[in-house]
Amino acid sequence: MDRRQHDYAASSGLPYAQQQQQQGPNFQQQQQPQFGFHPQHPQYPSPMNASGFIPPHPSMQQFPYQHPMHQQQQPQHLPHPPHPQMFGQQQPQAFLPHLPPHHLPPPFPGPYDSAPPPPPPADPELQKRIDKLVEYSVKNGPEFEAMMRDRQKDNPDYAFLFGGEGHGYYRYKHFLSMHPPGGPFDPPFPSSSMPMIHHPPNPMMSPSMNNVPGALAVPPIRQPPFPPFHDHHQLQQHLPQPHPFAPHARPDFDQSTHAFRGLSGPLPADVAMELNGVLGNLNGTKESIKSAKIWFMQRSPFAPALAEALRDRVFAMDDSDRQMHIVYLANDILFDSLQRRTNLHEFDNEALAFRPILGSMLGRIYHFPQNKEENQSRLEKILQFWASKEVFDQDTISSLEKEMKSGPPANTFSHSPIIAAHALQRPGMLQQPPNSNVSSTMNLEHLTNPVATQQFIPNVMPPGAFPGSIPLNASVPPPTQPPAGEKPPPYPLFPPGLIPGMVRKMQIGSGVPYSPLSPLDIPTVIPPSDTPQSEVLERVSKFFKEIGEVNPSEGPMGSESQDDYDNYERDSPQRKGGACIPPPPNLQVDPETGTYADGSTDKKSGSGRLGLGATADPNEPTQYDDVYTSYRKHRSTNYHTSMSARATTR
């Protein structure tokens, strides 16, 4: 394969060889590189080019393919392959046996766009962010890039959109994704998050779609699928272009038609799965609703599809409280977007996305039998609140209220990607047969237009989308929905924290000063007991037997015979003469207190067993009027008996 240089010269024509011999060594010195630079071609054609040879473009000199053994002679490059008849007049080539530079495919399609590809950024997170944005931009068109420029203009993580770090790599990846060598549109990324399956606008009119397997059936969401990317040039010619010098112009908002111009395609599968988890964890707490709102606002380019998924989730629920949680979430999203409006008289993208679906969603909850009266008053207050805060104009509020009170149409329930993704996780969910006892005539009154007159039925899953599933008729309510005439038991909707607030309000600032309880309000008569007195006495007697004590209500302890010591008259015997012997110390009475040394008083007949303050007659009715008095008498009797016994032994 390797041939010498004279072989090329021998095969060339004679006139050209003689012309090369006449030029001499001066021309060879002129062709040698000086100071390490490649030789520059003359600006004007030399006499040697008078035979029809055109010098190459300077951009083609970036591929010199110089070799040390062949630097004495510079080859002549052509901008395009010459005619076959001119092969005999060309100079012998000094290249090794490989393709010359003008036969190598350039890295870019353009004839002069020969700059080397920019390297990826050093930050792997930035490179991942750029690749993800390029993927979504290719799948959704230039509107997505314009929207991201408008929304992320103050975010330093997206500085590559405005000439920052990684801008060249972003443009290079975007260019390669837009112009792949395999065809007009061949996406280089695996379509894991952006499915490119385009179903026909009406699956009911296409019976061939019934054979699509369930893993590939991702239905559209009320919008026709976006066209392939090679048709975007025709699409851009019909769309109004924003003014290039408007500083606050939003390219995703059509000022003429006031319609959302974001991502109107189907919801990606990964976003649908995330939304399914967010709504599964949604409850009535403020933290849960706030976190769900933040998640929604971070994915605001998919606002129409997300709003559709929220509406479909409301129709799939049979719990009115969870339905109201989604309404509260939509309320927070609308008010968060309201604060970001530059013009209060123009709807933001979130308001435009929720406006077509709010009427049917509110109508579903408004006519739901569970907690019907409470939810109706709540929904009416929410609409009035939106009107007062100018979330929507008065015409829109009136339209929403009319649609809410008229009831949701029977064909609004459909399967969104979030429900489809949820069904993929639980394959047996749709395999239950519908309730045969539920009459379909109750929904016929809501059907204003027959199915045959409808041109587009959005969000209808093909009947064979899931293996083993059954087609779900739109006119039949879900099987889990309770009958309309059956009212569930009332649920205690008592707001937490109400009682402490009421108590605090009564304590502070109520104006009522403190006043003691009046004695007149205290009852003087003990109310009669329902328990018979005999049962009470029996239980008291049983109690004293268990503790080993004597029941005071049954009388004093001891025998019926009176103690001689207790009945002893303590009067001093009268003496008839001799010295007077004083009584012992235990029988001397204290003149100040009138008691003996043991604490007892001077006893008279019948009062030996009574304590301090006891009357002389133990048979008086006041002594044994209750068990407490008798018990006190009994205990004091034992005390005085023991004290007297001790005093006697001394």
Curated annotation (Swiss-Prot):
Q: Which SUPFAM superfamilies match?
A: Surp module (SWAP domain)
Top-level division of the source organism's lineage: Eukaryota
**Swiss-Prot/TrEMBL keywords:** mRNA processing, mRNA splicing, Nucleus
Annotated region described as Disordered, given as residue ranges: 1-126, 548-650
Q: Which GO terms describe its molecular function?
A: RNA binding
Instruction: Note the InterPro entries from the entry.
Output: CID_dom (IPR006569), ENTH_VHS (IPR008942), Surp (IPR000061), SWAP/Surp_sf (IPR035967), SWAP1_C (IPR056922)
| Subcellular localization(s) per the UniProt record | Nucleus; Nucleus speckle
Gene Ontology cellular component annotations, sorted alphabetically = nuclear speck; nucleus
Effect of inactivating the gene: Reduced sensitivity to red light and day length-independent early flowering. Plants lacking SWAP1, RRC1 and DRT111/RSN2/SFPS have pleiotropic phenotypes due to altered alternative splicing of many pre-messenger RNA (mRNA).
- PROSITE patterns the record matches: CID (PS51391), SURP (PS50128)
What are the GO BP annotations of this UniProt entry?
mRNA processing; red or far-red light signaling pathway; regulation of photomorphogenesis; regulation of RNA splicing; response to red light; RNA processing; RNA splicing
Give yes or no: UniProt keyword Aminoacyl-tRNA synthetase: no
Biased composition range(s): Low complexity: 18-43, 61-77
How does it associate, per the subunit comment?
Component of the SWAP1-SFPS-RRC1 splicing factor complex which modulates pre-mRNA splicing to promote photomorphogenesis. Interacts with DRT111/RSN2/SFPS and RRC1 in a light-independent manner. Binds to the photoactivated (Pfr) photoreceptor phytochrome B (phyB) in nuclear photobodies.
Described by its record, this protein's role is as follows: As a member of the SWAP1-SFPS-RRC1 splicing factor complex, modulates photomorphogenesis by regulating the gene expression and pre-messenger RNA (mRNA) alternative splicing of a large number of genes, including those involved in plant responses to light signaling. Involved in calcium homeostasis, growth and proliferation.
This chain's protein is named: SUPPRESSOR-OF-WHITE-APRICOT/SURP RNA-binding domain containing protein 1
Organism of derivation = Arabidopsis thaliana (Mouse-ear cress)
